[in-house]
Amino acid sequence: MGVHPIIRRRGRTAIAACCVALVALVSPAIAGTRTSSSYHLTTHLGLKKVRDSAGPQQIRILHLSPGKNVPDIAPATQQYPMWALTSSMSARAGAIAGINGDFGTSRGQPKHTLMIDGELWTTGQSGGDAVAWSANGKTAYIGHPSLKILAKDRDRTDAFFVQGWNRGAPNGGSIQGYTTRGGTVTQPPGKVNPQATDPHFCAARLTPTAPVGWNGKARTSIVRQYKVEAQPSPCPKTPLGFNGENDAVVVAAEAATPAAGKITGLRVGDKIRLSFTFKGWRNVTDVMGASEMLVKKGNNIAPGYNPGDNYILNYNPRTAVGITKGCSDVDTTTKCRLIFITIDGRQGSTGWSKGVRLPNLAKQLIRAGAYRAVNLDGGGSTSMWSKKRNPTFCESTPSVGGCLVQRPSQSNGERATRSAIVVMPSGDAGTPRGLR
């Protein structure tokens, strides 16, 4: 009897050892095998191609260390509505790589905040988060953009905030700003042929008198000087146009609101200073709006999916951008890297790539080194383009040249979007001199 426990113990030990061996053999198949290849597109830009058999998933990662190569934003067109392919926007900009940008509306507007080379295009149609960077790309931020637009009448020591920019008609007592970027979609309020029931709007047209620049060494606000060129009185029902001035700004408020007094208080010839301030984001010249935060201070904060949730939280192709801790800390010895990632999806049945939910996307970004990260447009919009062609990483070759390094989910290829984040080969020539 005394011997049997020892024998049984050995048996258990042997069985346990056998089980461990089996787990060691089986676990990779359960967890998925991950294979990767890395390529140098330039000295500062690398491409990593990853296949994870769990899913399966096809992942593409661009690592940018800003230096000679810098990030920039390429718009689909110069005015709304905006529609173009990521490959076309990237190639037209003279970029060496690019990914699709923010979500958009059915009317061809960016959905969230968009600033390009120091010019605010829109405050967006809804809230959201954003990625932002300096002209040289060595400072970057990700989070919720806290933007203040202040108009100061330097002749009358009066000031007012502008609540929206190329967003829509004034409502709720707000003052809205408009530029020619709004195109045929977002225009100054009013009706060309108004009816008796249409509201009156008070508006003023401002034209620039000086180049754009910073508010000083702190570089916390982008500023520009204007003069009041027109301020119709009494406030009409018809819109105030730009009078052929591409750089003109129209500010407007509904006549029946207290905000109208700020507009009617302006006089033709008054000197106005407009300032654009992203709180806590100094030195920023480019801002790309986005949706959900994925990574914050190195932690995965992506929203999960539960049955009945919006399909956007389920398995989908994905595009996202992340930054390292060195992009926005005060330690000058830490370096900034930007991380652009795409994960193909809706192609699981072919064995190519299933797509991921947002927590898995965040996991991949953290693995790639992201300290903060945010979700961009995905689904059929997900695209990553490279100017350099290499048969080992190219998946298709668009007519504009270069290649797509991933496979769009739509059978007809890329889907048109509103903008792209691109990597420029030698600085950002589009940034005005006063903001460099």
Q: For each predicted feature, which ranges?
A:
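Secretory targeting and sorting signals
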Residues: G2-A31
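Gly/Ser/Thr/Pro-rich low-complexity, intrinsically disordered segments
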Residues: R12, I30-R436
